Amino acid sequence: MFWHLTRILVLLGCLQGVLAIEHDSICTADDICPEPSHTIMRLREKNDKKAHSIAKKHGLEIKGKPFLDGTYYFVVHSSEKRSRRQKREIISKLQEHPDILLIEEQRPRVRRKRDFLYSDAVSEPDNGSINVVRHATSIANAQQRINSIQRDVPVLPFPDPLYKEQWYFNNGAQGGFDMNVQAAWLLGYAGRNVSVSILDDGIQRDHPDLAANYDPLASTDINGHDDDPTPQDDGDNKHGTRCAGEVASVAGNVYCGVGVAFHAKIGGVRMLDGPVSDSVEAASLSLNRHHIDIYSASWGPEDDGRTFDGPGPLAREAFYHGVRVGRDGKGSIFVWASGNGGSRQDSCSADGYTTSVYTLSVSSATIDNRSPWYLEECPSTIATTYSSANMNQPAVVTVDVPHGCTRSHTGTSASAPLAAGIIALALEANQNLTWRDMQHIVLRTANPVPLLNNPGWVINGAGRLFNSKFGYGLMDAGALVKLALIWKTVPEQHICTYEYKLEKPNPRPITGSFQMNFSLEVGGCESGTPVLYLEHVQVLATFRFGKRGDLKLTLFSPRGTSSVLLPPRPQDFNSNGIHKWPFLSVQTWGEDPRGMWTLMVESVSTNRNTGGTFHDWSLLLYGTADPAQPNDPRHPSNLPSSGSIESPFDRITEHIASQEVMVAFTKELNCLCTGAQRSL
């Protein structure tokens, strides 16, 4: 065996390096593939007049707005009737046009909202003026509270009738925990001058609890090719409106509850209410990127335990350009729900949206500070917000369609918008935060203490607690805002790539039940700028196996941190394997990457005749040569000495096993976090 080192100097190289990703949703055989929903055309430069001229000449019609700097949708003109063969002939001719860089048919992909049907069954829409007004008039000094919201610092509690049921704002979780949002509000932050867009099935822009905060510049209808994101009134398109209400429901209007960032501007993209193709996703992710600060998505591929799927080349390009040029170069912030496939033993590592370097992946916890039954585990999760587990537990309060309210929003669908709202508070505090700054401060301020009674907590080689279910802990709005106020932009990011190749050109055969280790020695890219402080770690792996779900991949860092990149998935009987799938871990954040990295490939197969081939793997290290600033409210290295807790600088890779250690650690970390927040 030998290893070969290459260095990637710019992010674009990384983008190009994963263009060969295969997805389970991609098909090429016409007899089994869905009909293309539309075709895209990319010109060498954006030119609306030329695009319409080309389309007209070939009996086509441009739909909607261009995206990605010169890419257009078009369909066969409504007055034309063309056979499949005739459509292909048109595309063939257009491929030879000198002004066209790309012409491609777009086929729909399966995308699912990450909520549950039971939430609709128990939903209690508090529609109205009758109950809501009656409740508001019973509140002492209600008008004084309403008036106070117009000032920088509100007087709590809010008069909104369902505010007291927003337990995740009001110390309502077991042990008196919440997401410390009131602390941010009382500092005067409510999301002013921050724009959030919900990428979903649309939002009801005239909802009385959203209308005052509605942002048309953060909204569009890609499914209907117009500017109105209003969802169809068919009972099945309430998801986006609910998510929008979590972020920016108006406070003090005696209707429903309040949004996390109740002064933020909220928009929506109607893109899930129709065929969802790569170009539909790309257009959504790149909408008005210099105006929109945060894109929130509570959907993804099938959470069925047998699918590998993620963004196509256009959507990956949209992510890349978003972080490079969005928000005037500071980078768009993409917040993503981690997935609801836990009951099917799915892993969010098989979801290419949550495993993107460019997304901030968010998990869920319940009111009793446990992991819900639907939760997926993976090492790309950064942090957690509250949601619910079943119909007997309080869920998330938000707006509903038509013009109503609900107490029953749930799933990781509910967690991502709460995170987006908390991030909006931090952006109001510091508009100069880059997309990487935001990942740093979310990770550093996430609070593990409420969730420590769950198994799986580990201290990484940089001394930080993490859990594959919850990331680095529960998001803490007060701590996030305080750290944002004093945060200095992180040093420039560098990327080093190490490729593992076999001694022989043929893939290595693997059979039955086995365990194999493949190691790479990392030196920190001495030939150029070194990576000495890790952020993201990606593994691009290629293999085939008789039953893909029998494989387990674990990555070990030089500091002893183990990340389960892919757990066994019993439902996954696919025999095609994966090709350069980008597994992502944030669990080694802050570590020094120099030393021996090992990828352990295991099989849980009981069938000796089940085999396959291991082809190659690459290790991509994202990080900096210099450390980010030292402010770290949750870093266990600041803990007082304790005989019951090992040093965070030891290579601790096992679970914190004993309840005595857990209790002691909780008490000490609580003291640390309280003091650290005050000092900020």
Enumerate the predicted regions with their spans:
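Protease zymogen maturation seam
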Residues: 95-194, 208-209, 226, 316, ...
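Extracellular S/T/G-rich loop segment that most often corresponds to the catalytic His/Ser-adjacent loop
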Residues: 200, 351-428, 432, 468
